[in-house]
């Protein structure tokens, strides 16, 4: 990440909106924003394979659900935050991921400029590819600042997305059971 470019750009934005980048309260803002971007866009430098390739052998293939995984991301259209919770259900294929690995996978894909719809797809596809599960269902419920503070200005509006792969695409009863266990 080019922190120097970010600092220059933030300084230019401050100036472009009619503020003084040398004013006491804004003097270190470009550096703060650059450090913040390094943190909130850290998913750009990560690979979910690193997290999901370490798995544990199991005897049966019962459904695994990890729900209410908190996340935040930045809308790629306006660079405004959106945040919420991710639910993941999957059917193992004789191997399970450590529970923290699912949360880390959410971080990999959410910590970059993103669309909620794509975030769903990327998490599901990573589970299928790197965990080699028989199927997965990923749901996201999120609130978007681009809906709250600009445009239509509808605070409190929730956006729900859902992606099914493998067994969850093929078996509606399985999909409905996962939704029920997720509380949806």
UniProtKB/Swiss-Prot annotation:
Molecular function GO terms recorded: GTP binding; GTP cyclohydrolase I activity; zinc ion binding
UniProt EC number: 3.5.4.16
Catalytic activity entry: GTP + H2O = 7,8-dihydroneopterin 3'-triphosphate + formate + H(+)
Cysteine pairs bridged by disulfides in the record: none
Pfam families per record: GTP_cyclohydroI
GO cellular-component term (any): cytoplasm
EC category name: hydrolase
GO BP terms in the entry: one-carbon metabolic process; tetrahydrobiopterin biosynthetic process; tetrahydrofolate biosynthetic process
Domain of life: Bacteria
Residues where Zn(2+) binds: 75, 78, 146
Keyword hit for Nucleotide-binding: yes
Alphabetized UniProt keyword annotations: GTP-binding, Hydrolase, Metal-binding, Nucleotide-binding, One-carbon metabolism, Zinc
CDD domains on file: GTP_cyclohydro1
Annotated pathway: Cofactor biosynthesis; 7,8-dihydroneopterin triphosphate biosynthesis; 7,8-dihydroneopterin triphosphate from GTP: step 1/1
Annotated NCBIfam families: folE, PRK09347.1-2, PRK09347.1-3
Family: Belongs to the GTP cyclohydrolase I family.
Subunit structure: Homomer.
Cited HAMAP family: FolE
Stated name of the protein: GTP cyclohydrolase 1
Natural source organism: Finegoldia magna (strain ATCC 29328 / DSM 20472 / WAL 2508) (Peptostreptococcus magnus)
């Amino acid at each position: 990440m080019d922190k120097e470019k970010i600092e220059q750009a933030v300084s230019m934005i401050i100036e472009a909106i009619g503020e003084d980048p040398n004013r006491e309260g804004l003097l270190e803002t470009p550096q703060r924003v650059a450090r913040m971007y390094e943190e909130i866009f850290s998913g750009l430098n990560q690979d979910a394979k690193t997290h999901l390739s370490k798995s544990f052998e199991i005897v049966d293939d019962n459904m695994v659900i990890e729900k209410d995984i908190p996340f935040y991301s930045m809308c790629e259209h306006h660079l405004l935050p959106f945040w919420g919770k991710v639910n993941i259900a999957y059917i193992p294929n004789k191997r399970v991921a450590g529970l923290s690995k699912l949360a880390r996978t959410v971080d990999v894909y959410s910590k970059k400029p993103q669309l909620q719809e794509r975030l769903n797809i990327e998490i599901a596809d990573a589970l299928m590819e790197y965990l080699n599960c028989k199927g997965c269902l990923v749901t996201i419920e999120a609130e978007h600042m681009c809906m709250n503070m600009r445009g239509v200005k509808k605070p409190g509006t929730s956006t729900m997305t859902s992606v099914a792969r493998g067994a969850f695409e093929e078996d509606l009863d399985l999909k409905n059971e996962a939704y029920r266990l997720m509380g949806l």
